[in-house]
Amino acid sequence: DPHSPRFMCYLSILTFFMPMLVTGDNSLQLFLGWEGVGLASYLLIHFWFTRLQADKAATKAMPVNRVGDFGLAPGISGRFTLFQTVDFSTIFARASAPRNSWISCNMRLNAITLICILLLIGAVGKSAQIGSHTWSPDAMEGPTPVSALIHAATMVTAGVFMIARCSPLFEYPPTALIVITSA
């Protein structure tokens, strides 16, 4: 294949951003890894850009994954607004203190509950769950080892990992726990 260097470049991008997502000790590093994995996924699905199906698959994958970003980004912003930090250990320490922070948008929402639900939306979008799975079968248009890598090791587990990483925050709002268990 004459495109092996490009393939290795895209694969290197993916393998650079996944450890960044996993080893990040703050929300910004997690978000950069999250976005990088999404970009690498798009590039790898779109690897054979001359094929119409690969083009359609990549074009479908990108907006569906952006849904997850529209949950994660406000969730991170909300955590920063509420806790004045992006560091996970500090957020978890401050979350244990009783908080009566409410957001009023024609209804009263507990701030931590809203943040957790936004994080869940991010995880659902990235992990191809509950309606956001439409791009996943089409991702097989990418090169075979990449298709397996994107599904098993990165995209699906990224959302699950983020929920697990933020689980100390999810302990406090009972409404968010109910939403997660029913999702």
Swiss-Prot record:
An example molecular function term from Gene Ontology annotations: NADH dehydrogenase (ubiquinone) activity
Topology in the lipid bilayer: Multi-pass membrane protein
Subcellular location per the Swiss-Prot or TrEMBL entry: Mitochondrion inner membrane
One Pfam family of this chain: Proton_antipo_M
Record-level GO BP terms: ATP synthesis coupled electron transport; electron transport coupled proton transport
Alphabetical keyword list: Electron transport, Membrane, Mitochondrion, Mitochondrion inner membrane, NAD, Respiratory chain, Translocase, Transmembrane, Transmembrane helix, Transport, Ubiquinone
GO cellular component: mitochondrial inner membrane; plastid
UniProt xrefs under InterPro entries: ND/Mrp_TM (IPR001750), NU5C-like (IPR003945)
Catalytic activity: a ubiquinone + NADH + 5 H(+)(in) = a ubiquinol + NAD(+) + 4 H(+)(out)
Top-level EC class as recorded in UniProt: translocase
Family in the record: Belongs to the complex I subunit 5 family.
Task of the protein: Core subunit of the mitochondrial membrane respiratory chain NADH dehydrogenase (Complex I) that is believed to belong to the minimal assembly required for catalysis. Complex I functions in the transfer of electrons from NADH to the respiratory chain. The immediate electron acceptor for the enzyme is believed to be ubiquinone.
Identification of the protein by name: NADH-ubiquinone oxidoreductase chain 5
Organism of this sequence: Pisum sativum
Lineage: Eukaryota, Viridiplantae, Streptophyta, Embryophyta, Tracheophyta
